[in-house]
């Protein structure tokens, strides 16, 4: 069975791209395709998969870090796909914190981002984009050609090696190129000997384990603190703190 991981920011068009991709893959001979959606709190996309005739399992991380939830369940998802006799299993997950990446070594990794998110968005997404094999850009039909080119350039600045494909989630334009790129993925039956391409967040502080109170006396474990100037005269306008602050 072939495994494809597809991730991207919320509402970037991942599900629409996947459904159009599946339509093309079926036409090319890959008939038995299943999907697993990893989400945080709620999702209604299972209805769209069911309408398309795609077996779907949806899991919600709830209070657990979404990427820890993903890596704790992905091998079980693969086993389900193998037992179900799928030719291909596609996983969909949202990169909620831009620090995370569900990409697995040796497994085709796709990152979906949309043109409407802003031309500087590619520089903010992090390892989910940087370590992807293929970057799919959506909603390019409702921005200018200049905006598309600038957005694509910024994607290339972050990831110099990925294949970049524009896909229209409504018409399906571009889905053929994506299917052609992914259909020759290697077959796998288990992920036990494989690794993530990037580390997940530490998840070892008191707030990770359920603490809700605010104050240094409640902050235990691995904490990252910012340094702030002693007065407003010491800070340059718009400057970012060197120990964790980030200029927006």
What are these regions (language model features)?
Residues 95-116, 124-133:
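Inter-motif core of Ras-like GTPase G domains
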Residues 2-16, 23-27, 189-248:
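P-loop NTP-binding site
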Residues 141-197:
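Canonical P-loop GTPase G-domain recognition
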Residues 42-46, 120-125, 147-154:
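Short, glycine/polar-rich helix-capping loops at beta-to-alpha or helix-loop-helix junctions
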Residues 71-76, 176-186, 206-211:
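Short, surface-exposed amphipathic charged segments that create phosphate/polyanion-binding patches used
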Residues 37, 59, 92, 110-115, ...:
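Conserved beta-strand segments of the P-loop GTPase G domain that flank and frequently precede/overlap
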Residues 2-12, 16-104, 140, 173:
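Nucleotide-state-sensitive switch-loop elements of NTP-binding domains
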Residues 53, 86, 106-107, 132, ...:
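Short, well-ordered alpha-helix to beta-strand connector turns
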């Amino acid at each position: 069975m072939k495994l494809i991981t597809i991730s991207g920011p919320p509402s970037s068009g991942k599900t629409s791209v996947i459904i159009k991709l599946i339509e093309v893959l079926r036409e090319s001979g890959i008939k038995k395709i299943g999907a697993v959606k990893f989400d945080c709190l709620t999702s209604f996309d299972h209805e769209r998969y069911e309408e398309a005739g795609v077996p779907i399992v949806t899991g919600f991380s709830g209070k657990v870090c979404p990427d820890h939830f993903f890596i704790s369940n992905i091998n079980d998802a693969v086993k389900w796909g193998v037992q179900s006799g799928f030719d291909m299993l596609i996983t969909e997950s949202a990169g909620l914190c831009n620090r995370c990446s569900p990409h697995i070594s040796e497994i085709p990794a796709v990152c979906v981002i949309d043109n409407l998110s802003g031309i500087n968005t590619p520089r903010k997404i992090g390892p989910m984009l940087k370590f992807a094999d293929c970057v799919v850009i959506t909603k390019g039909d409702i921005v200018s050609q200049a905006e598309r080119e600038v957005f694509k350039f910024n994607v290339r600045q972050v990831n110099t090696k990925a294949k970049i494909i524009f896909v229209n989630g409504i018409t399906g334009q571009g889905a053929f190129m994506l299917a052609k790129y992914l259909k020759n993925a290697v077959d796998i039956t288990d992920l036990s000997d494989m690794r993530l391409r990037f580390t997940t967040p530490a998840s070892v502080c008191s707030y990770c384990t359920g603490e809700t109170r605010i104050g240094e006396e409640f902050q235990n474990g691995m904490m990252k603190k910012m340094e702030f100037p002693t007065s407003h005269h010491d800070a340059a306008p718009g400057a970012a703190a060197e120990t964790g602050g980030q200029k927006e």
